[in-house]
Amino acid sequence: MRTITLIVVHCTANKAGSTLRVKDIDRYHRSLGWKGCGYHYVIPTDGTIEKGRAEDLVGAHCKNHNKHSIGVAYVGGLDADGKTPKDTRTPEQKIALWKLIKELKERYPKALVVGHCDLDPRKPFCPGFKVHGGQSSDHRNLDGFRRMVFGDCLSARCFGAARAEGKHAFTMPSRDKTNHR
């Protein structure tokens, strides 16, 4: 079993509104000669949580930190022109990111939650928002992370808005260990 010390949040660096799914990322990463999707989880714009690489496998998402981290990416990160970094997370993605991080923190309570930019100065705009959220570098504080994820939107309003619009339930994918990519 791997020792997980980091949960690294990424964006996929796609235009706002992209319909990219984990299968598309998997295909692209394989075209680069990788073993499959480098992220452990991907959150498309509709807020589903899609499983990429199995958690027990080393990811391919953050140089020098893959062996001890879980990689989570939301689809987006660029504005409509595809050139300018921007926080393009939908309300559904914000809710899903919060739920996923909360679940991961239950499994890996000592892991720190960081943005890709916090570990790699060559990626200053990934994930497109400030993961620190004004909090200390100790991201064990889930309440601080919740405020960062939702920004100006109170979590209750986001959850309520999603429910009022009849959005699907946000559930974790199964942790089937046979999905080795």
Regions found by a protein language model. Give the residues of each.
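Short, conserved "active-site rim" segments that organize catalytic pockets and cofactor/ligand binding
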Residues: 1-57, 66
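Basic/polar, cationic surfaces and motifs that engage anionic cell-wall
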Residues: 1-12, 45-49, 65-68, 77-181
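Gly/Ser/Thr-rich helix-start
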Residues: 37, 53, 60, 77, ...
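Short amphipathic alpha-helices and their capping/turn segments at secondary-structure boundaries
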Residues: 56-63, 102
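Ligand-binding face of N-terminal immunoglobulin V-set domains in extracellular IgSF glycoproteins
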Residues: 72
